[in-house]
């Protein structure tokens, strides 16, 4: 099951004992998923949802909290609609429900944001409003660089109200308009986990965090692999360059170099991929890595001085650009 569907399914089963929280959740659910229609002179309340469990929860809450009957109609998938959608419709008592849930104000005008009884309520109601908003029009992407919890809003007023509700429960959320659609977004991974926990999606938080950790481990492993590859390439280039310079040094000096320096140089040529520490261990008698490095360095310096005196190419000239392409 996709993350969004899993969260909505879990939220549809959250038990909310406090009446004020049930009203706040329902107000947000109807505000973010619903609309008011005038049919034959009567106000009809509708909410379109993409999860059957959420539609059944809304229908039950309307009956238990306000005592009004409602209908559920199923819209089969087709066209731009990827899956089945569910319409919860209140016809007979639509205007009463709209007034009681804050969709209409005392003068019968539509409320564009969240109703006052939600905006000015306790923190628990702010949490319930977020639960309702997510069940109505929320989405959660997989953890990663562009992970986000997002609510699609019916307008800028409701988006600002939802940002304010998030602030009251200690969550940083931002509202933005994308292609003419208002959205509220939470992008920080820790904030997403905290918000899901507050609204009651505990199992979904564990699954999301597990995927988040797995992705971070995979990204770290990839970075280390790339780092190791880069180190290997650098080491290979250094080995090729060192071998070329030592070969040229032995050509320049011929038999004039001290035996202990030429021995170190030949050891380098015989074991081109060995580290300095390994090279020192192969010497007879064994040398420290600093000692073997010092002997090779003196061999190259002696050869370069001889080359300058003779006016011939030195050891650096033996290193060609194509040798450094590994």
Swiss-Prot record:
Residues 275-308 bind DNA. Pfam families: HTH_WhiA, LAGLIDADG_WhiA, WhiA_N. Keywords: Cell cycle, Cell division, DNA-binding. Belongs to the WhiA family. PANTHER family: CELL DIVISION PROTEIN WHIA-RELATED (PTHR37307:SF1). Involved in cell division and chromosome segregation. This is Probable cell division protein WhiA.
């Amino acid at each position: 099951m996709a993350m969004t569907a899993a969260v909505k399914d879990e939220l549809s089963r959250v038990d909310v004992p406090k009446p004020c929280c049930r009203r706040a959740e329902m107000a947000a659910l109807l505000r973010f998923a619903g609309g008011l229609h005038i049919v034959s002179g009567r106000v009809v309340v509708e909410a379109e949802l993409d999860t059957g469990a959420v539609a059944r929860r809304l229908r039950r809450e309307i009956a238990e909290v306000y005592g009004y009957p409602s209908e559920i109609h199923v819209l089969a998938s087709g066209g731009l609609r990827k899956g089945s959608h569910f319409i919860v419709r209140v016809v007979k008592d639509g205007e009463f429900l709209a007034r009681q849930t804050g969709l209409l104000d005392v003068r019968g005008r539509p409320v564009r944001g969240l109703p006052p009884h939600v905006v000015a309520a306790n923190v628990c109601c702010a949490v319930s409003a977020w639960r309702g908003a997510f069940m109505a029009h929320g989405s959660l992407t997989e953890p990663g660089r562009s992970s986000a919890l997002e609510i699609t809003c019916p307008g800028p007023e409701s988006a600002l109200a939802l940002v304010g509700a998030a602030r009251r429960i200690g969550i940083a959320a931002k509202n933005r308009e994308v292609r003419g659609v208002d959205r509220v977004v939470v992008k920080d991974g820790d904030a997403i986990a905290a918000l899901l926990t507050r609204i009651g999606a505990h199992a979904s938080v564990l699954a999301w965090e597990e995927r988040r950790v797995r992705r971070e481990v995979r990204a770290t492993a990839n970075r280390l692999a790339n780092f190791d590859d880069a180190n290997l390439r650098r080491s290979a280039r250094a080995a090729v360059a060192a071998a070329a310079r030592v070969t040229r040094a032995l050509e320049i000096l011929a038999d004039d170099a001290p035996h202990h320096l030429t021995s170190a140089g030949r050891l380098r040529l015989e074991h081109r991929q060995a580290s300095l520490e390994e090279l020192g261990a192969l010497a007879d008698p064994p040398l420290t890595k600093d000692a073997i490095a010092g002997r090779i360095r003196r061999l190259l310096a002696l050869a370069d001085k001889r080359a300058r005196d003779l006016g011939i190419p030195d050891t650096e000239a033996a290193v060609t650009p194509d040798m450094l392409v590994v």
